[in-house]
UniProtKB/Swiss-Prot annotation:
Biological function: This protein binds to the 23S rRNA, and is important in its secondary structure. It is located near the subunit interface in the base of the L7/L12 stalk, and near the tRNA binding site of the peptidyltransferase center.
Tree of life domain: Bacteria
One Pfam family this sequence matches: Ribosomal_L6
Protein's recorded name: Large ribosomal subunit protein uL6
Taxonomic lineage from the root: Bacteria, Pseudomonadati, Chlorobiota, Chlorobiia, Chlorobiales
GO function terms (MF aspect): rRNA binding; structural constituent of ribosome
InterPro entries in UniProt: Ribosomal_uL6-like, Ribosomal_uL6-like_a/b-dom_sf, Ribosomal_uL6_a/b-dom, Ribosomal_uL6_bac-type
SUPFAM superfamilies noted in UniProt: Ribosomal protein L6
GO BP terms in the entry: cytoplasmic translation
Gene: rplF
Keyword Secreted listed: no
Family affiliation: Belongs to the universal ribosomal protein uL6 family.
Length: 179
């Protein structure tokens, strides 16, 4: 049995879960998330614990078991606590600002880059070199953060670009001086 899949998911007092046929809905103080389940797993809730069981030991069912357990766990965490991804901008003249729900990025190009986030995602700019992406859907928060990072990925020679908080950029030496 999957090590991740067999662990029960504890429900907090704030989260409520509804299981109907092949759909699961988790609601909490921050919002509501829905997920369609595959026919390879079954979900049950009792005594504040959600358990995910697979229907057989086929390869596909084993693969889906841990996946759906983590998806449901992330849904519970999202509607109660939420998720945040912090991006750091490094480089001379590189900065970010918020203009009318648009993230305006100056990243060394000849033009500014404007990014409109989905409605479910909240973007904050506490200072010019920090961008906070937050929301209740972990996958969507990560996807939006990756999209913002893709506008100017960190480069290994000077370390300029947009990187995740705590991300380590392997630095390269560059060209050696003439001999």
């Amino acid at each position: 049995m999957s090590r991740i899949g067999k662990m029960p998911i504890p429900l907090s007092n704030q989260a409520k879960i509804e299981i109907k046929d092949s759909n699961i809905r988790v609601s909490g103080p921050k919002g509501t998330l829905e997920q369609r389940l595959t026919d390879q797993v079954t979900v049950s809730e009792e005594n504040g614990l959600v358990t995910v069981l697979r229907i057989d030991d086929s390869k596909k069912a084993k693969a889906q078991h841990g996946l759906y357990r983590m998806l449901i766990s992330n849904m519970v965490d999202g509607v109660t606590k939420g998720f945040t991804r912090k991006l750091e901008i490094a480089g001379v003249g590189y900065r970010a600002e918020l203009k009318n729900d648009l993230l305006a990025l100056t990243l060394g190009y000849s033009h500014m880059i404007y990014f409109k986030a989905p409605d479910e995602i909240k973007i904050e700019v506490p200072d010019q070199v920090t961008v906070l992406v937050s929301g209740i859907d972990k996958a969507l928060v990560g996807q939006v953060a990756a999209k913002i990072r893709s506008f100017r990925k960190p480069e290994p020679y000077r370390g300029k670009g947009i990187k995740y908080e705590g991300e380590v950029i392997r630095r390269k030496e560059g060209k050696a001086a003439g001999k």
